[in-house]
Amino acid sequence: MKDVTIIGGGPSGLYASFYAGLRDMSVRLIDVQSELGGKMRIYPEKIIWDIGGIAPKPCHEILKDTIKQGLYFKPEVHLNERVVDIRKKAERHFEVETEAGEIYTSKAVIIAIGAGIINPKQLDVKGVERYQLTNLHYVVQSYRRFKDKDVLISGGGNTALDWAHDIAKIAKSVTVVYRKEDVSGHEAMKTLVTDLNVKLCPKTRIKYLVGNDDETHISEVVLEHVESGDRHTVKFDDVIISHGFDRCNTLLSETSSKLDMHDDCRVKGFGNTTTSIPGIYACGDIVYHDAKSHLIASAFSDGANAANLAKTYIQPDANAEGYVSSHHEVFKEANKTIVNKHLY
């Protein structure tokens, strides 16, 4: 039996893992995705400005450090496992069950599932799956691949406009198609992309994808006006889909441990990351409490808070908070290495 099972490997879950390790707890970390990082993996190239003391840098750089920190105390990690139930058997005895039927036991549970299981909405066009490993994209991993390319973006929200704005600086051309009369993203961003000569095509959708000779890459796209039905075919090197996300939060609605909810999709926190069930804590975007800010920075704070509460639940005579890291014995040898690196 582990001290704590953390469900969710995004920034809050990773920091909870680190801080629980710092508090000398054994940790199990479970995530439904094939990689740790949560929603941060959706926008790896976006520049993050709002983490205190961290200079603005691409999200993938922050994520790399966050994962490294989260794994510092060597938690037991399970990827590609979907949690379907949390059962409280007794005080300091929880069972976490996965879709595959695995049952993991721990003394406390931290829920850090963000907005739930998030997957980009797929383009509903025949044969689309054959291009998903080549030049059809739902996530932009690197802007560099679009250098000097003709790029089509489908979607009119903020993410689509952000990608159009950034890619237009290096691409040969960028075209944005969207079904409505106007984009739904910020008006200021619409002005910016227009200034960069991004072509905006309202009331237009992707009707067909035309492949190359061996059907491995998209070579042309048939676009259709949603009202008139007029169609025209355009050559593109890459196609990016930004149609929002499908979200699944069935864990909270179907679990045996019925938590008080703030709304249909967030756990009610009682002043912090405490939930209505002793021994279960929630951190990050999945929890609502009065001091909540939906920032990566506050996800870290939530993670530490949840770990501290789990510690005192498991061991009531433990200190409510851990020692500051600069004075913590566990980092003594690691600190010597870091100091020597900077001195010499």
UniProtKB/Swiss-Prot annotation:
Q: How is the cofactor bound?
A: Binds 1 FAD per subunit.
Q: Where does FAD bind?
A: S12, D31, K39, Y43, V83, I118, D285, S326
Tell me which domain of life the UniProt entry assigns to the organism this sequence originates from: Bacteria
Q: Which Gene3D superfamilies match?
A: FAD/NAD(P)-binding domain
- Which cofactors is this protein said to need? FAD
Is Nucleus among this UniProt entry's keywords? no
Q: What class of enzyme is it?
A: oxidoreductase
Keywords assigned = FAD, Flavoprotein, NADP, Oxidoreductase
Name the Enzyme Commission number(s) assigned to this protein: 1.18.1.2
Which BP terms does GO give this entry?
cell redox homeostasis
A molecular-function term among this protein's GO annotations? ferredoxin-NADP+ reductase activity
Which reaction(s) are listed as its catalytic activity? 2 reduced [2Fe-2S]-[ferredoxin] + NADP(+) + H(+) = 2 oxidized [2Fe-2S]-[ferredoxin] + NADPH
**Is Ligase one of the keywords?**
no
Q: Which PANTHER family match?
A: THIOREDOXIN REDUCTASE 1-RELATED-RELATED
Family label: Belongs to the ferredoxin--NADP reductase type 2 family.
Question: Tell me, how does this one assemble?
Answer: Homodimer.
Q: What protein name is recorded for this chain?
A: Ferredoxin--NADP reductase
